[in-house]
Amino acid sequence: MRITAIRGGRGRGKRVNVFLDGKFAFSLEAEVAVREGLQVDQELSASQTEALARSDHFHRCLNAAVYYLSYRPRSESEIRERLQRRGFNGDSIEAVIAKLKEQGLVDDMAFAQFWKDNRQSFSPRSRWLTRLELRQKGVADDIIDQVVDAVDDADSAYRAALSKARSLPLSDYQSFRRRLGDYLKRRGFGYEVINQTIGRMWQEESR
């Protein structure tokens, strides 16, 4: 089979259409076509065509993963599940994840640290709830243990309560206690920590 034309595809994607023996045969990422050195009048065997298809699939899978990572760091499990939903095959997905690991773009330890730090800075919650969230992201328990064990529930509950307490009326202690307690419970804190935090906040806010 001989390449008789290589034409730019329609739309915003950087793809090219390859024609063999005068007929449209397949499309490729333009980057793949350049890297493989495709030229008009070049002869392609069936095995070469299949190899090009595999390379194109991998490249599209890689681009999808990098785009997904552009919003925030992701766990390995999140990336794998996302690519599976996009319909990429298992071989390409595993090859892409391996490449991203080599480049330092996928690292579950770094991701878990990011997640914990982000939560503690902007939306403090309990060690238990942080652990649950990371487990839902597919992070391994041994990594979770290393990262989450440093979370101090008493400190996190106090910081979580600071902004909430200021929005609560101080004329009714029972209402203050109930509303702040419910708020901290939703953040995953236990009974003892909640009671201690409510007592501390009531003293500070009602001075």
Which residues does each PLM region occupy?
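An alpha-helical, amphipathic repeat domain used for nucleic-acid recognition
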Residues: 1-207
